[in-house]
C-alpha cells in the first residue's frame, strides 16, 4: 500500500509538470504567437520558472535557517556552488547526485536548539506561498495560464518534497518528528557537510563520528553509521567496516543509506579481491549512479573496479585521470584524501608492474 501511494504521488507530480508546460505554451498562444513560437517560448518560460523555483526553495531553507540561528555555508544550483568563507563568497563547480537540482548547507551555532524542523520546512513553505501568489496573480490579471504554470510547478515540487522517501525534506521532517532524539545525528551530518566545504584539510573524518544507539532508526543515524564504516576502511579495519555496512543494510528502509552501504561494500570487495561480490554490488543501479559521479573517491573506486573486475585498462586509465584532476576539488577531509591518494598510487604501481 505504501509503494502504491508513493507511485501515485510520483504520477501526480509528473502530471503537474506536464500541465505546467502545457499552460506555458497556451499562455503564449493566447498572446498571438504561432504554434511553434508559442511552444518554444512556453517551454522556455516553464523551464526558467523551474530553475527560479529551485533557487527560491533553497532560499526558503536559508531564510528559515537564518531565523533559527544557522550560518550560511553554501548555496548551489546544479553543478555551481556558492560557498561563504571568511565573509566572502566563492563560486565553484561541484559534482552532484542525480535528481538534486539545488542545495543549501548551513552550520548551526547552537546545537541545543531543536528547531531544525523549521529550517527543513523552509522550501515547502516557499512552494505553498508561491502557489498562493500565483492564484492571486491569476485573479488580478486574468492570465490564468501564466499563473497555472507556477501553480502546477509548485504543486509538483511540493508533492515530491513532502514525500517521506529518500533524502527529501519530507523524509527528514518525518524522521525528526518520529525520532526527535535523532536531532544530534542531524547536526553532526550538517557539521560534516559544512566542513567539507569550509576547511576540508583541517579535519579528519573521524572528527565527525559519534556513538549511535543500537536501536536508532532513520537516515541521520544511518549517515553517522556509514561515516563510521568509512573510518574503519580508512584505518584498515576491513572486517569491522564490513560488519558496519551490513548492519545498516539489514535494518534500513532508506534507499540512500542502502546505496551508500552497498557502494562501500563494493570497495571492501575490491580490497579483499572478491571480484564476484564486487560485480554483484557494481551492477546495482544506485551504485552505478555513484560510480558515475566525477569526484576523486568515486573515480578511484571506479578505476579499481575496471582494473580488477572488468580488466579494462582503457576505462581504468580514464577513471584514474578524472580522479587525479578532481583530487583537490573533491569534498574530502584530510584522512579521506590521503587514503584515496595512496590507493590511487597503489593502482598506478600495479599497472606499471603489469605493463
Please place each PLM-identified region on the residue numbering:
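Terminal, low-structured helical/coil segments at or just beyond the last alpha-helical repeat
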Residues: 319-355
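Structural signature of alpha-solenoid helical repeat junctions
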Residues: 220, 253, 257-260, 294-295, ...
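Alpha-helical adaptor scaffolds
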Residues: 226-236, 246-310
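Hydrophobic transmembrane alpha-helical segments that form the core helix bundle
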Residues: 108-198
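Topogenic membrane-insertion module of multi-pass membrane proteins
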Residues: 1-46
Amino acid at each position: 500500500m505504501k509503494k502504491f501511494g508513493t507511485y501515485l504521488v510520483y504520477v501526480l507530480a509528473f502530471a503537474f509538470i506536464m500541465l505546467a508546460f502545457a499552460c506555458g505554451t497556451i499562455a503564449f498562444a493566447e498572446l498571438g504567437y504561432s504554434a511553434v513560437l508559442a511552444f518554444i517560448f512556453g517551454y522556455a518560460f516553464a523551464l526558467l520558472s523551474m530553475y527560479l523555483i529551485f533557487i527560491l526553495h533553497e532560499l526558503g531553507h536559508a531564510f528559515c535557517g537564518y531565523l533559527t540561528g544557522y550560518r550560511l555555508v553554501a548555496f548551489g544550483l546544479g553543478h555551481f556552488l556558492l560557498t561563504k568563507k571568511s565573509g566572502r563568497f566563492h563560486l565553484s563547480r561541484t559534482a552532484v547526485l542525480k535528481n538534486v537540482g539545488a542545495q543549501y548547507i548551513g552550520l548551526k551555532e547552537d546545537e541545543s536548539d531543536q528547531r531544525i524542523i523549521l529550517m527543513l520546512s523552509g522550501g515547502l513553505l516557499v512552494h505553498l506561498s508561491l502557489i498562493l501568489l500565483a492564484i492571486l496573480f491569476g485573479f488580478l490579471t486574468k492570465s490564468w495560464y501564466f499563473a497555472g504554470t507556477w501553480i502546477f510547478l509548485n504543486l509538483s515540487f511540493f508533492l515530491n518534497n513532502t514525500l517521506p522517501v529518500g533524502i527529501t525534506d519530507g523524509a527528514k521532517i518525518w524522521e525528526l518528528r518520529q525520532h526527535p532524539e535523532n536531532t544530534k545525528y542531524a547536526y553532526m551530518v550538517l557539521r560534516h557537510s559544512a566542513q567539507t566545504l569550509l576547511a576540508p584539510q583541517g579535519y579528519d573524518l573521524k572528527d565527525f563520528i559519534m556513538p549511535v544507539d543500537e536501536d536508532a532508526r532513520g537516515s541521520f543515524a544511518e549517515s553517522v553509521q556509514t561515516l563510521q564504516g568509512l573510518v574503519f576502511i580508512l584505518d584498515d579495519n576491513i572486517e569491522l567496516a564490513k560488519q558496519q555496512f551490513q548492519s545498516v543494510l539489514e535494518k534500513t528502509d532508506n534507499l540512500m543509506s542502502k546505496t551508500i552501504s552497498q557502494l562501500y561494500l563494493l570497495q571492501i570487495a575490491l580490497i579483499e579481491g572478491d571480484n564476484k561480490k564486487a560485480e554483484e554490488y557494481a551492477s546495482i543501479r544506485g551504485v552505478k549512479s555513484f560510480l558515475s559521479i566525477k569526484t576523486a573517491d568515486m573515480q578511484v573506486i571506479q578505476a579499481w573496479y575496471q582494473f580488477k573486475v572488468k580488466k579494462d585498462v582503457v576505462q581504468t586509465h580514464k577513471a584514474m585521470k578524472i580522479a587525479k584532476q578532481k583530487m583537490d576539488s573533491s569534498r574530502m577531509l584530510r584522512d579521506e584524501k590521503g587514503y584515496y591518494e595512496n590507493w590511487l598510487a597503489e593502482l598506478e604501481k600495479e599497472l606499471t608492474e603489469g605493463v
